[in-house]
């Protein structure tokens, strides 16, 4: 039985089974306070940064899985159960959960007692709000125990030094509010570290701040010893293992519904906590928070909507893909069920790609994020790899051959969305001092690549390109990336256009000449006969060739030969035919074929430690699939493009593999799916935070549906199979709302007219 259903009118996925193969997550956030929560109530909250201001424990990779979280125990006579289903052994008789846009809701019933718990981070205050409604079929007295297992805010410090540092923590009660003070020596940014508070709008009959008192020795969240006592111990904690637990007694009459709210929040001082709680306890606070949340998402989604005969694709394009994309834009690749949130800040490469997809939906946010990325560029044009704007730590300074070129693509598409190049005159600082206009920044991106070319004429790999595992081909500094040459060519085309519009014909000609050089190399030296080679090692060996014993064909150089236009038309078609022949599976396109052993190309300089079919070594790397979809659209092969897109839709991939094999969420994209050379073929891995989200959105909206900005207006250039026609699209562009009906794959330009607010057109 399918354990879920989509309810698109509410933008929700509703689950009927709590013990799905892995935790299926949702993200809650107001931009400052954040949380992720599973379908069983497990999860973690953090203030601004999960590295230095993590609020509660979440035990990654441990058993039982998905612990701890945000739990509300209901004690009804001798029975103790949770609306979240977990962690109690005593289960509800009826249960379902729903993940929505910025909230998660649980509905459960046991012995005539119905409970509905809604979790959200309020957009009005820095508080994670737990709203609980109880309805009884008879008179009864119940006690509600909300519980959070607190941890040290610095996760890595806790792993290493908790035996000392936990005795520098304080959790105490003041005026009915539990307050957690994190005051550890040498902590980063102590003046910005908030107090965390826990309270309810129902008077508490007891509380605990000491985890040992509430949970008990050799106990777990499944059966806390505190629930066996008449009352909690009112324990405070000045050193030890902290928690928040409240005891909230309620009397319910037959047929009566009572609601209560629990507040897990942050403020800088006790007085600010009091003010915040006064606002939170207003009768309409929950309703107002939900309404503001709904309004913000309605505005977000209004920039692009579509209607398609394929309702799975429509569900992803209209709701879950842009929702996931926004979460990537907000959190980069920092913390998820798979990523511990301990070492990655904001990746320049990662976030620059997120910006591309955000431009049509939230233009100002996209510009702001792009300008933040520019601060990580050096005067010579290269960029830091990732950085820590909240934590203030030193950035990771590895020089990759691709990072700075993504900035060119961002700048181009921002200018294109506006229809002019004036934005490029905006000043932006360099990381190593001084400043320049955005135009000067991206010109330096081009200069850096031209000054770092290899012996064969392709860009040097440097620390690696987009495919991080290729760092081993360039340890001596001579390895070259054929793929980066293709990315460079895409950037050069964009720069040529921008230069012409800025009145710099000499630079435009320079870009044109550089492009021609890469094109000539690609059509000769990079061409292997049936596909394009991938890279060149320090010793001059071509990786990605029929003559090689392993990893003969790589996906990215085939798709980007089309995206860049470097290959001849015949080469482009042949390369993508080879993708279909050697790399395509019913669960997506493999990254390479065949997978490598751990002694290729040599035992000393092996390219991978991954098992065959896993990760970089022959999995379906979903991010890279997106470029193949775009390439097939550019070649005007809609059947291939749609196959590659449709088979990767998470609900379709899960159905193909089977829910127990696929494991991950059926409503968001994953980074990779184990390939056919693995005995776990079909296992989805690293969901939510992946560049797949941004590029699947771009592939669907700008290439399959074909609605793309141009300098002169909105271009409609769809590439859809016949069974998907007619399709309808709403796109807001330069202040005008376009209502477009697509009846055939025909190219059409809708010129922009200043002042026009709406246009309805049929293609």
What are these regions (language model features)?
Residues 102-105, 124-125, 152, 438, ...:
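Hydrophobic, small-residue-rich alpha-helical packing segments that form membrane-like cores
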Residues 709-742:
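Surface beta-strand/loop "capping" patches
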Residues 75, 346-351, 355-458, 481-489, ...:
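Aromatic-rich carbohydrate-recognition surfaces in CAZymes
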Residues 336-345, 384-403, 431-433, 437, ...:
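Carbohydrate-binding/catalytic loop surfaces
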Residues 147, 164, 384-385, 487-604, ...:
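Catalytic cores of carbohydrate-active enzymes
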């Amino acid at each position: 039985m399918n354990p879920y259903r989509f309810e698109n009118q509410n933008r929700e996925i509703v689950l009927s089974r709590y013990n799905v193969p892995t935790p299926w997550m949702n993200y809650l956030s107001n931009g400052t306070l954040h949380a992720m929560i599973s379908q069983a109530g497990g999860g973690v909250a953090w203030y601004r940064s999960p590295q230095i201001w993590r609020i509660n424990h979440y035990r990654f990779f441990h058993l039982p899985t998905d612990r701890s979280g945000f739990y509300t125990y209901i004690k009804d006579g001798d029975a103790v159960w949770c609306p979240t289903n977990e962690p109690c052994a005593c289960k509800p008789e009826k249960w379902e959960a729903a993940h929505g846009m910025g909230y998660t809701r649980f509905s459960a019933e046991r012995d005539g007692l119905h409970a509905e718990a809604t979790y959200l981070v309020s957009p009005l205050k820095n508080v994670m709000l737990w709203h609980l409604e109880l309805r009884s079929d008879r008179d009864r007295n119940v006690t509600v125990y909300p519980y959070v297992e607190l941890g040290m805010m610095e996760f890595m410090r806790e792993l290493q030094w908790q035996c000392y540092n936990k005795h520098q923590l304080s959790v105490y009660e003041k005026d009915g509010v539990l307050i957690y003070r994190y005051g550890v020596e040498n902590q980063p940014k102590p003046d910005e570290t908030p107090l965390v508070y826990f309270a309810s709008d129902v008077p508490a009959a007891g509380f605990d701040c000491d985890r040992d008192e509430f949970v008990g020795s050799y106990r777990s969240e499944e059966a806390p010893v505190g629930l066996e006592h008449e009352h909690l111990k009112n324990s405070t904690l000045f050193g030890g293992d902290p928690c928040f637990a409240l005891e909230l007694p309620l009397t319910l009459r037959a047929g009566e519904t009572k609601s209560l709210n629990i507040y897990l929040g942050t403020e800088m001082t006790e007085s600010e906590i009091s003010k915040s709680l006064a606002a939170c306890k207003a009768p309409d606070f929950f309703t107002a928070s939900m309404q503001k949340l709904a309004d913000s998402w309605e505005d977000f989604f209004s920039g692009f909507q579509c209607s398609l005969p394929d309702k799975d694709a429509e569900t992803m394009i209209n709701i879950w893909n842009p929702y996931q994309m926004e979460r990537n834009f907000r959190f980069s690749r920092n913390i998820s069920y798979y990523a511990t949130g301990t070492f990655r800040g904001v990746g320049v490469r990662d976030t620059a790609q997120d910006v591309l997809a955000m431009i049509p939906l939230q233009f100002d946010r996209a510009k702001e994020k792009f300008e933040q990325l520019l601060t990580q560029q050096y005067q010579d044009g290269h960029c830091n790899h990732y950085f820590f704007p909240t934590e203030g730590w030193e950035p990771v300074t590895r020089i990759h051959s691709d990072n700075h070129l993504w900035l060119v693509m961002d700048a181009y598409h921002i200018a294109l969305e506006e229809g002019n190049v004036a934005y490029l005159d905006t000043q932006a600082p360099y990381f190593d001092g001084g400043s320049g206009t955005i135009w000067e920044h991206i010109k330096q991106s081009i200069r850096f690549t031209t000054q770092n070319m290899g012996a064969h004429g392709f860009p040097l790999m440097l620390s690696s390109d987009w495919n991080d595992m290729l760092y081993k081909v360039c340890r001596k500094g001579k390895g070259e990336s054929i793929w980066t040459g293709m990315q460079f060519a895409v950037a050069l085309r964009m720069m040529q256009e921008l230069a012409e519009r800025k009145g710099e014909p000499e630079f435009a000609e320079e870009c044109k000449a550089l492009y021609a050089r890469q094109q000539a190399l690609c059509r000769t030296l990079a061409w292997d006969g049936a596909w394009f080679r991938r890279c060149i090692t320090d010793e001059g060996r071509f990786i990605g060739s029929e003559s090689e014993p392993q990893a003969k064909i790589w996906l990215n150089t085939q798709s980007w030969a089309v995206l860049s236009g470097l290959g001849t038309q015949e080469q482009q078609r042949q390369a993508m035919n080879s993708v279909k022949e050697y790399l395509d599976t019913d669960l997506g396109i493999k990254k390479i074929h065949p997978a490598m052993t751990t002694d290729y190309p040599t035992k000393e300089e092996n390219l991978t430690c991954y098992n065959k079919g896993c990760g970089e070594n022959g999995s379906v790397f979903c991010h890279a699939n997106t470029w193949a979809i775009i390439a097939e659209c550019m070649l005007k092969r809609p059947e291939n493009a749609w196959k590659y897109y449709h088979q990767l839709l998470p609900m379709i991939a899960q159905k193909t593999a089977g829910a127990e094999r696929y494991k991950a969420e059926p409503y968001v994209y994953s980074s990779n799916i184990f390939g056919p050379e693995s005995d776990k073929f079909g296992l989805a891995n690293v969901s939510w935070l992946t560049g797949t989200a941004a590029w699947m959105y771009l592939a669907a909206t700008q290439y399959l549906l074909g609605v793309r900005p141009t300098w002169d207006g909105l271009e409609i250039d769809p590439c859809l199979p016949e069974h998907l026609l007619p399709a309808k699209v709403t796109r807001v562009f330069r202040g005008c709302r376009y209502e477009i009906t697509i009846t055939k794959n025909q190219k059409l330009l809708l010129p922009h007219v200043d002042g026009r607010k709406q246009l309805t057109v049929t293609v």
